[in-house]
């Protein structure tokens, strides 16, 4: 919230620039506003770190372990979501009472999904009771993240796809039971989910 307010204040400087030099003021204000978002965060180490690779080196198995560990909540960010084992695990989590919410890239999963597989997956998740949104405000929504129970974070290069599990060189890292790290990732997830649109199932 603080950064949003400061960004608005920086852009408001343009209103006082007058006609002369307004373009330069706009560039300065936009640069200042952009700088407010260019930040990193640090958290204290806690919990256990587990990692795996692919193809066929345990990456997908570790993702499934995280989903299977969830007792109350899963928050997920995806670019690709076509892995049958991952989708089945998410649906199983929902059926055992876990609140599952997902934000996924619109272009990859809807607009350019020529096979219809990605749309079928999103529909299956919605029909199972998961909350699914797609986001299109970025050229690519490339996050690959799962936050389980507000304490465990899974991330890495691993797309939730068959290719990532069986063909591509990928990595997965899980930080178990680190609530501060999970809090930061949840803030990022919320910022994307809030800008997404509910996926309307066609099945």
Protein language model annotation of sequence segments:
Residues 80-84, 106-110, 138-141, 152-153, ...:
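Solvent-exposed loop/turn segments at secondary-structure junctions
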Residues 1-9:
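Bacterial N-terminal signal peptides that target proteins for export
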Residues 25-56:
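N-terminal low-complexity, Pro/Thr/Ser-rich intrinsically disordered segments
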Residues 48-72:
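Mature N-terminal segment immediately following signal peptide/propeptide cleavage
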Residues 65-127:
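Primarily the HKD phosphodiesterase
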Residues 25-28, 40, 148, 152-203:
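Signature of lipid phosphatidyltransferase scaffolds
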Residues 17-19:
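N-terminal signal peptide c-region/cleavage motif recognized by signal peptidases
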Residues 50-55, 78-79, 130-132:
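Short, flexible loop segments at the rims of nucleotide/cofactor-binding pockets, characterized by
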């Amino acid at each position: 919230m603080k950064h949003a307010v400061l960004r608005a204040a920086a852009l408001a400087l343009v209103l006082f620039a007058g006609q002369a030099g307004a373009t330069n003021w706009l560039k300065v204000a936009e640069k200042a506003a952009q700088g407010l978002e260019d930040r990193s965060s640090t958290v204290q180490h806690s919990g256990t770190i587990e990692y795996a690779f692919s193809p066929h080196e345990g990456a997908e198995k570790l993702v499934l372990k995280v989903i299977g560990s969830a007792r109350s909540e899963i928050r997920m960010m995806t670019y690709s979501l076509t892995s049958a084992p991952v989708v089945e695990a998410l649906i199983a989590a929902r059926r055992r009472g876990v609140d599952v919410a997902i934000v996924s890239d619109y272009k990859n999963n809807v607009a350019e999904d020529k096979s219809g597989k990605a749309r079928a997956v999103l529909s299956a998740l919605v029909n199972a009771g998961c909350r699914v949104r797609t986001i299109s405000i970025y050229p690519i929504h490339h996050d690959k993240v799962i936050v389980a129970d507000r304490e465990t974070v899974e991330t890495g290069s691993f797309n939730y796809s068959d290719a990532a599990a069986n063909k591509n060189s990928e990595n997965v890292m899980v930080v178990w039971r680190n609530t501060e790290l999970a809090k930061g990732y949840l803030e990022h997830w919320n910022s994307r989910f809030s800008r997404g649109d509910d996926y309307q199932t066609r099945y």
